Swiss-Prot record:
Main location: membrane
Keyword tRNA processing found: no
GO cellular component terms given for this protein: plasma membrane; proton-transporting ATP synthase complex
GO MF annotation: an example: proton-transporting ATPase activity, rotational mechanism
Protein name stated in the entry: ATP synthase subunit b
Known role: F(1)F(0) ATP synthase produces ATP from ADP in the presence of a proton or sodium gradient. F-type ATPases consist of two structural domains, F(1) containing the extramembraneous catalytic core and F(0) containing the membrane proton channel, linked together by a central stalk and a peripheral stalk. During catalysis, ATP synthesis in the catalytic domain of F(1) is coupled via a rotary mechanism of the central stalk subunits to proton translocation.
A Pfam cross-reference name: ATP-synt_B
Quaternary structure, from the entry: F-type ATPases have 2 components, F(1) - the catalytic core - and F(0) - the membrane proton channel. F(1) has five subunits: alpha(3), beta(3), gamma(1), delta(1), epsilon(1). F(0) has three main subunits: a(1), b(2) and c(10-14). The alpha and beta chains form an alternating ring which encloses part of the gamma chain. F(1) is attached to F(0) by a central stalk formed by the gamma and epsilon chains, while a peripheral stalk is formed by the delta and b chains.
Gene3D superfamilies in the cross-refs: F1F0 ATP synthase subunit B, membrane domain
Length: 178
C-alpha cells in the first residue's frame, strides 16, 4: 500500500490540472479576444499596404507607359514636322533659286539686247562716218581724175549718193548671186 499511497510523479494532481486548465482557458480567451484581433489588424494593414503599394506601382507603371507613349507620339510628331519644315525649306530654296535664275536670264537678255542696240548704233554711226569719208575721198579722187571741180556741196553730195547707191546695188546683186 505504500506504493499505492505514493503518487506517481508523472501524473499531476487533479486540482492542479483543473486550475491550470482554467488559467489556460482564461489566457486563451484573452488571446482570442484581444491579442489575435490586434495581430489580425496588423496583418490586414500590412496586406492592404502591400496591395496598395502594388496598385500604386501598377498605376505608376501605367502612367509611365502612357507618358512614354505620349513622348514617342510627340517625338514622331516632331520628326514629321521637322521633315515638313525641311521639305518647305527645300521647296522655298528651289523657288528662290528659280527666281534668281529667271532674274539672271532677264538681266542677261536685257544686257544682250542693250549690247545689240549699242552695236547696231555703232554700226550705223560707222556706216555714216564711212559714207562721209568715202564721199569726201571719192569727191577728191573724182575731181583729180575728171579734172572737174566738185567743190559745190550739193553737186558733190549727188555724185557721192549716186556712187554709193550703185555700190549698194552691186553688193545686192553679188549677195543674191551667192
Amino acid at each position: 500500500m505504500l506504493a499505492a499511497e505514493e503518487a506517481n510523479p508523472l501524473i499531476p494532481d487533479v486540482w492542479e490540472m483543473l486550475i491550470t486548465g482554467i488559467g489556460f482557458v482564461i489566457l486563451l480567451f484573452i488571446a482570442i479576444k484581444y491579442i489575435v484581433p490586434a495581430f489580425e489588424k496588423v496583418f490586414k494593414d500590412r496586406a492592404d499596404a502591400i496591395e496598395g503599394g502594388l496598385a500604386k506601382a501598377k498605376a505608376a507603371q501605367a502612367e509611365a507607359k502612357a507618358a512614354r507613349d505620349e513622348y514617342n507620339q510627340q517625338l514622331e510628331s516632331a520628326r514629321l514636322e521637322a521633315q515638313k519644315i525641311r521639305e518647305e525649306a527645300r521647296s522655298e530654296g528651289e523657288k528662290i533659286l528659280a527666281d534668281f535664275k529667271d532674274r539672271a536670264n532677264m538681266e542677261s537678255a536685257r544686257i544682250t539686247e542693250n549690247a545689240h542696240k549699242a552695236i547696231e548704233a555703232e554700226r550705223a554711226a560707222a556706216v555714216v562716218s564711212l559714207r562721209d569719208e568715202v564721199g569726201t575721198l571719192a569727191t577728191q579722187l573724182a575731181s583729180k581724175i575728171v579734172g572737174e571741180s566738185l567743190n559745190d556741196d550739193d553737186r558733190a553730195n549727188r555724185v557721192v549718193d549716186r556712187f554709193l547707191a550703185d555700190l549698194d546695188a552691186e553688193q545686192g546683186r553679188t549677195g543674191a548671186a551667192r
